[in-house]
Amino acid sequence: MTIIINVRERIEEWKIRIAAGFIREGKLVAFPTETVYGLGANALDENAVKRIFEAKGRPADNPLIIHIASFEQLEVLAKEIPEEAEMLAKRFWPGPLTLVLPKSEVVPRVITGGLDTVAVRMPAHEIALKLIELSERPIAAPSANISGKPSPTSAHHVAEDFYGKIECIIDGGETRIGVESTVIDLTEWPPVLLRPGGLPLEEIEKVIGEIRIHPAVYGKSVDTAKAPGMKYRHYAPSAEVIVVEGPRDKVRRKIEELIAKFKEEGKKVGVIGSGSYDADEVFYLGDTVEEIARNLFKALRHMDRTGVDVILAEGVEEKGLGLAVMNRLRKASGYRIIKV
C-alpha cells in the first residue's frame, strides 16, 4: 500500500513528519524538489538505498545523489571540500546544483556505484528540506521513475510508476524547473560538467571560471559514470523519438514532411515543440526555454498515454537551459537526430 500525503495547498509539518518516519524506518518516500520528484531513502542505510535500485530497476553502477539540508551534512559526507565547492554552495544552494566530491567513509559504496566520489546537493524546495530536516538524515534520491522512463514532474507521474510499490508519495504539486540538477565534478581541474541541468553552465562559470564539458553530455559512451544520466539511456517514452535540429523555419518544414511520411505508413504521430502541426497529437511546450524545460517530461509522458508510434521533437538552441533540454531530448531519442 502507498500512502499519498497531499500538501499541494498548504505544507503542514505533521504530514511531513509521517513521511520522515518512513525514511527513518528504512522505507522509500517520493517527494518533490524544484527540479523533478525524487525517490528517497536514508542515505546512511545501505539496505534502504538498495531498495531504491530494486524499485527503479536501476543498474548498480549508476550513482545516486545525496540531498542535504545544511552545510554541516556536507562536511560529514565529503572527505574534502575545496574552496570552489564552498563558493558554489554559498552562491547557488539551496538550488539545482549537484557537486561531486571525494566521499567520506560514512557514505555507503552502493550510493556511489563503487566509486570514491559522492554527488551531493541541497534542494531549493520547502518540502524536500523539511523532509530531510525532520528525518534527521541525508536522503539519497534519484528521480522517482522506473529507470529509463521520462522523469516525473508531478505526484501523478510518480504514482504511474510506483503506486503500490513504495510506502509514501508526498504530493506537492508540479515541479518548478522540470529537468534535473546540473552536476559538476570538483575532483578534477578544471572542473567538469557531467550533466547539464536546472542551473545554466554560464552562471556557474561566472563564479569559478572555466568548466570543461564531459563528452558524455553530447552522447559519447563511458565505462564509468560519476553522476546519473551519463552512461545509460534515460528519459525515454515507449514511442520512437526523433529530434529535428536547425533553424526554426527549416525544422518546421522538416517536421511537416516527416508527419506526412509517417502518416502514409499508417503510424500515429505526435509532435512536441513550440509550433502548431497537423499531427495526431501536439504538445505545446512553450515559447521560452524555461517553459520548454518545465514541460518537457510532462510532454513525453503525455505522448506515452496517447499511444503515438513516433514523437517528433523540435530542437532548441544550446544556451542556458537549452543545453539541458537538448541533452534530455538526445538521450530520449537514443540519438536519432536529424539536422537541417
From Swiss-Prot:
**Catalytic reaction list:** L-threonine + hydrogencarbonate + ATP = L-threonylcarbamoyladenylate + diphosphate + H2O
Q: Does this entry carry the keyword Membrane?
A: no
| NCBIfam families in the record | L-threonylcarbamoyladenylate synthase
EC assignment: the record states 2.7.7.87
Q: Which domain of life is it from?
A: Archaea
Q: Which GO terms describe its molecular function?
A: ATP binding; double-stranded RNA binding; L-threonylcarbamoyladenylate synthase
- Name the UniProt record assigns to this protein: Threonylcarbamoyl-AMP synthase
Name the GO cellular-component terms. cytoplasm
Regarding protein family, the annotation reads: Belongs to the SUA5 family.
Q: Is Cytoplasm one of the keywords UniProt gives this record?
A: yes
**Could you say which enzyme class this protein belongs to?**
transferase
Q: Which amino acids does the record list as binding L-threonine?
A: 35, 67, 121, 141, 181
Instruction: Give the keywords, sorted.
Output: ATP-binding, Cytoplasm, Nucleotide-binding, Nucleotidyltransferase, Transferase, tRNA processing
- Could you tell me where this protein is found in the cell? Cytoplasm
Binding locations of ATP: 58, 62, 117, 143, 151, 195, 235
| InterPro entries found in the cross-reference section | DHBP_synth_RibB-like_a/b_dom, Sua5-like_dom, Sua5/YwlC_C, Sua5_C, T(6)A37_SUA5, TC-AMP_synthase_SUA5
**Biological processes annotated in GO:** regulation of translational fidelity; tRNA threonylcarbamoyladenosine modification
**Where in this chain does the record put each YrdC-like domain?**
13-199
Biological role stated in the UniProt entry: Required for the formation of a threonylcarbamoyl group on adenosine at position 37 (t(6)A37) in tRNAs that read codons beginning with adenine. Likely catalyzes the conversion of L-threonine, HCO(3)(-)/CO(2) and ATP to give threonylcarbamoyl-AMP (TC-AMP) as the acyladenylate intermediate, with the release of diphosphate. Does not bind tRNA.
The gene from which this protein is expressed is sua5
What species is this protein from? Pyrococcus abyssi (strain GE5 / Orsay)
- UniProt cross-references to Pfam families, sorted A to Z: Sua5_C (PF03481), Sua5_yciO_yrdC (PF01300)
